[in-house]
Design a protein with these regions (language model features):
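Proline-aspartate-enriched helix->loop->beta-strand connector
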Residues: 439-452
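Cys-nucleophile CN-hydrolase/nitrilase-fold catalytic domain and related Cys-dependent amidase chemistry
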Residues: 454-475
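Active-site regions of metal-assisted phosphoester/phosphodiester hydrolases
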Residues: 2-442, 470, 475-477, 483-647
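Short active-site-proximal "capping" loops at secondary-structure junctions
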Residues: 452-455, 601-602
Length: 647
């Protein structure tokens, strides 16, 4: 006999509970990845990666917690401890690895318990649980727009604390309502374990690509506001398609085509740009939502599945999620034998094969309770998503109008800076505000920032280029490296009259690097050209050859023009540093000059880590290079360049 649905109030509370649990889980996940990045650098990428992947098996704790505290108390206890852990994440600096792991693991178990509660309530619970998770991903998108994609868990401003407290208070309130309502905390839930497993590959696609504003704006080459609007569109479409396919089902041929579409889109999407990236993201969202909807609908009315099987299935999917995220990014550090794009493609294929194997329902599914629910959820997602996008558009910095004030002799002082921020992660802490303050301390007119992430998982899937541009009120020129989501940005408080990107290609390294060329208007009627970027690191002969080839390409782009500055993390050491760095002669022989020691790592870059350089054309006098702030890895360098009177 089908289970009767709970009251509307309890249903709304349960959906809100799972949605808010999803938001908190995603925040804890991103925090863990940033902290784990630092730990991986210390204990080894393979070891650190295995530790993080193992943690994602935490959903198996759901049945353990039920056994320890009882079915009725398990979810409230998990939520209470999670609230404390989430507040501790934001209050503790630096965030210790154990705390990040504990909060993330508990959040995964709590999500599993919340989904099990929804699935235990009535026959349509499996579909409703997927709608609730989808709503949570969309709500997470909106929450992150308040910090231009920088997570509130890392922020210390009053608005971030108020938002965190509000979200957690809502989570507690929803838990109380569900606990008092007519959703019985059964030890079994309706449907098989398949959807609990498939949820995680589906989440991978949403969180990393189709509903990631940073991924979408970087790939499409549009502002963050537009990327947020695109993510909101994908969220609404995904919810509608999921519920529609849960009602009407998909024949095996349709599932096969959908699976092929998901896998193909997932393989191509990481390198897609422009309008093609937008179309592929929407296609991947539609195909994946159709497959998950068909699987959820097929589970309606199935025999009950114990919480143990649900926990194990969820743990298996979560481990695949973690493996996919880490293997994809770590390919740039320790290359795989094949392209890392096979990772999302394999996850998409796994999603497809699992659904194709399901029996086709004998009749159309009547999902009476879920249909009005998803209408309200989709409408809410659309409204808050587009309002958030409009708010981002309204607060975007305008075109810079600053000029350099001439001295008595007509010359102008141009302050330049190079800063490798290592994805914004300093000793495990994603503190973008600290980086912005360090840039402000140097007071540059133009700064080249290397190792900038725009949607990469290890930096919390933040759009760091957009965030820095907004925070500092500077214009940006983006140049990709590993993909459209990782590279370098030129920030300028002066007007940029022209900008282009020079492709450096890919040879011995894992990244297809590029160099930005920005033409600045300094106010004297004559342009100043800035070339900035990041070259491949390493001292193998093949890497030396690659850097030399990159220098030649950059120098060709320069073409000997006057009033030119070349700077960045060039990963080139002084010539006498073993094993010898002859490629440094290329810019020097071409006529560029520097005040840095070209033979040894001497002051100011004297910590035996001096790969960062500032060169100028012969007509631009430059003051000695300075270290702006002492950091554990790359120390930002700055110098004042004198622009002689024009004419």
């Amino acid at each position: 006999v089908p289970a009767s649905p709970p009251s509307r109030a309890t249903l709304a509370a349960a959906v809100g509970l799972v949605a808010l649990l999803t938001v908190v889980a995603l925040e804890c996940l991103r925090t863990l990845l940033s902290v784990g990045y630092f730990v991986g650098e210390r204990i080894g990428w393979i070891t650190g990666g295995l530790v993080v992947v193992a943690l994602f098996a935490a959903p198996v704790l759901a049945p353990v917690l039920r056994r320890l505290v009882g079915s009725t108390a398990a979810l409230p206890v998990a939520v209470a401890v999670l609230v404390v852990g989430r507040l501790a994440l934001q209050a503790t600096r630096p965030v210790p690895f154990w705390l990040a792991m504990a909060a993330a693991g508990l959040s995964f178990a709590a999500v599993t318990l919340g989904i099990a509660a929804l699935r235990s309530a009535w026959d349509d619970g499996s579909v409703t649980a997927m709608v609730a998770v989808g709503a949570g991903v969309a709500l997470d998108l909106v929450v992150r727009t308040t910090g231009a994609t920088w997570d509130v868990a890392w922020r210390q401003d009053p608005a971030a604390w108020l938002l965190s407290i509000g979200l957690l208070a809502g989570l507690v309130a929803a838990t109380v309502l569900v606990h008092r309502g007519d959703i019985a905390p059964a030890d079994e839930d309706h449907g098989g374990p398949l959807v609990a497993f498939l949820l995680w590959p589906y989440l991978y696609l949403l969180v990393v690509t189709t509903q990631s504003p940073a991924f979408l704006d970087a790939a499409a080459g549009v502002p963050l506001a537009a990327g947020t609007a695109l993510a909101a569109v994908n969220a609404v479409v995904g919810l509608l398609v999921l519920v529609a396919m849960s009602r009407i089902g998909l024949p095996r041929a349709g599932r096969a085509l959908g699976g092929l579409a998901v896998s193909a889109c997932a393989f191509v999407l990481p390198l897609a740009t422009g309008a093609g990236a937008v179309v592929l993201a929407l296609a991947a969202q539609v195909a994946a939502s159709a497959l998950l909807g068909a699987a959820s609908g097929a589970e309606r009315g199935e025999r009950h599945t114990g919480i143990v099987r649900t926990g194990l299935a969820s743990a298996g999917g979560a481990v695949l999620f973690a493996a996919g995220v880490l293997v994809y990014v770590l390919h740039t550090i320790q290359p795989l034998p094949v392209t890392n794009r096979v990772v999302p493609a394999v996850l998409g294929l796994l999603l497809a094969l699992s659904v194709i194997a399901r029996p086709v329902p004998d009749r159309r599914r009547e999902v009476i309770t879920t249909t009005p629910l998803v209408a309200w959820v989709a409408a809410g997602v659309a409204v808050i998503g587009f309002v958030s996008a409009a708010a981002l558009a309204a607060t975007a910095p305008g075109t810079p109008s600053a000029t350099l004030t001439p001295a008595a002799d007509g010359s102008r002082a141009l302050r330049v800076m190079s800063f490798n921020i290592d994805q914004g992660v300093t000793e495990g802490q994603l503190d973008l505000e600290q980086i912005a303050e360090q840039i402000e301390e140097a007071d540059p007119d133009v700064v080249v920032v290397e190792e900038v992430a725009r949607g990469w998982s290890l930096s919390g899937m933040t759009d760091e280029a957009e965030w820095l541009g907004r925070r500092l009120g500077m214009a940006t020129v983006w140049s990709p490296a590993a993909d459209a989501q990782f590279g370098n940005v030129v920030l300028s408080r002066l007007p940029i009259s022209d900008a282009r990107v020079v492709d450096l290609g890919k040879t011995a390294g894992t990244q297809a690097r590029s160099f930005a060329v920005a033409t600045l208007d300094v106010g004297d009627g004559q342009p100043v050209t800035v070339l900035g970027g990041h070259l491949q690191n390493g001292d193998d002969p093949a890497i030396h050859d690659e850097r030399a080839a990159s220098y030649r390409t950059i120098l060709d782009a320069w073409g000997g023009r006057p009033r030119t500055i070349l700077l960045g993390d060039l990963n080139t050491y002084p010539r006498e540093v073993p094993p010898g760095w002859p490629e440094l002669n290329l810019p020097l022989d071409a006529g560029l000059r520097t005040t840095q020691d070209v033979d040894r790592c001497t002051a100011p870059t004297s910590n035996q880590n001096c790969p960062d350089w500032i060169f100028t054309s012969a007509d631009l006098p430059v003051a000695p290079v300075e270290i702006v702030v002492d950091r554990p890895d790359h120390r930002p360098i700055a110098a004042t360049v004198t622009i002689p009177p024009s004419g």
